[in-house]
Amino acid sequence: SVAINQYTGEVLALVSTPSYDNNDFIRGMSSEKWNALNEDENKPMYNRFRQVWCPGSTFKPIIAAIGLTTGAIDPNEDYENEGLSWQKDSSWGSYHVTTLHAYEPVILKNALIYSDNIYFAKAALKIGERDMESSLTKLGFNEELPFDIKVAKSQFSNTDKIEKEIQLADSGYGQGQILVNPLHMACIYSAFCNEGNMIKPYLTYKEDAIPNVWITAAFTKDAAQMVLEDTKEVINNPHGTGYAACRTDITLAGKTGTAEIKASKEDTTGTELGWFSVFTTDENMDRPIMIISMVEDVKGRGGSGYVVKKDSQVLEKWLSDN
């Protein structure tokens, strides 16, 4: 998990669990303990917040903002109901994009509320390979994060470009070859709160810190505002996938995600990553917070719903201590 102040860039927490006691290294460690740490299947020495991960549906607000910024997406265009399975045409062979919920009208706001894979696959095709690549490059993909701790670079492809139409479509809902670092994800989401500008994160506490922008005009102001309003609906609309985190005292925004990690569409043995990106939306509150959480192996544990519950507990503690 990563927690930041999305308006200043102050990093509030970087968490990787399971973990280990750093003091054991200072005092000296027996070979038995060292071997136990190294051989633990839960990998306590693997620093998860420094890695890149498949983001699943938490990527959809980013695609929405890219589509709105480039003009490829008309937020009021009805993509029409295709059922729960869709392919562009027969050139895709047996490959279909699947989704979980049917709803009407099939417009951007509803697609985010219901987390519609088919809508965002179509949106990605409308954006196109080259504009997708240039937009993600502008957001800092394939680039070092300007931060005190070195983290892995986010990527949109295993090569330097999106090679195939199906890969482009899958990228629209955070699958394909998309891999994102959680802190980088927080920086991108910060643009929804800062009129389209991505905040630069910092680690060391500063009194009355002046926010530094990492990427100016990552999205247009209008695009950022629309995605902000739509991600509020994800949490506050009873049909929203993040509704379990809804609060009556403050307005939250965010997006859930369940990323499938498997060898092929037919693979039933793969695992799932559960994601929840959630943030406060009142710039004037005392202690604003944005939390980006990813939990490995949530298959059979409720997918992203498992992470929503965890983050809701953290938010409750943070806000009650405020």
Regions found by a protein language model. Name each.
Residues 210-212, 308-322:
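Short, gly/Ser/Thr-rich active-site loops of penicillin-recognizing serine hydrolases
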